[in-house]
Amino acid sequence: MNSSSVSELLPGQIWVVAACFNEEAVICTFIERVLALPEVSHLLLVDDGSRDGTVVKIRSWQQRFGGSKASIPVTLLELTRNFGKEAAMLAGLDYAQGHCDAVVLIDSDLQHPPELIAQMAQAWRHGAEVVTAVRDDRDQESRLKVATASWFYRVFNRIVDSIQLTDGAGDFRLLSAPVVQALTQMREFSRFSKGLLPWTGYRSVELSYSR
């Protein structure tokens, strides 16, 4: 993999790490919305082997606005092929570790509202080590999708009694630096971050949101 940045990497407060896969239609809008947040000190985009113009769009944005518009550094990390979202998130955490006090993991497809990061940062400053965004408006999804998701969480929570997963919680989370360090030390081949996070035992809070 290789990376390019619009400015030198410096230690910061909160980094946003976003996995990207075939998001050319929305990636520039995503960047703009993240950069509008005063809580964010760095945006790291991890391209997971996109086959469309995602990388071209990001590089074009860097060239056009990197100097004048991006007081927040925007870094592009390119994976050599499509490794999957878990691998992309881990690559981003590896890259960010040691440079910041907290990392926000978020999808770049705008299914997660970047503006919620302000509330996540506030919860973190009040002592939370993990802040998880939980959807509370799943009525627009198909009944089959809602039913299968609910079934998965019920079965998982019955089988694994040492941890409990929340239905509606995805990968949109803020992680403190100690949590990032703990996760990057776990090098499982087939990762399931939703299960690894509660297992680490750090103080966690949840924030509800609607799409």
Predicted regions and their residues:
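Active-site donor/metal-binding and catalytic loop motifs
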Residues: 200-211
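Acceptor/aglycone-binding surface of glycosyltransferases and processive sugar-polymer synthases
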Residues: 73-74, 79-81, 85-95, 114-196
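Short beta-strand/loop segment that forms part of the nucleotide-sugar
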Residues: 18, 31, 40-50, 77-78
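Short beta-strand-to-loop acidic/aromatic patch adjacent to the donor-nucleotide binding site
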Residues: 99-111
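Short, well-formed alpha-helical segments that are part of the catalytic scaffolds
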Residues: 23-37
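A conserved acidic beta->alpha catalytic loop
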Residues: 47-56, 110-111
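Acidic helix N-cap motif at the loop->helix transition within catalytic regions
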Residues: 25-29, 52-61
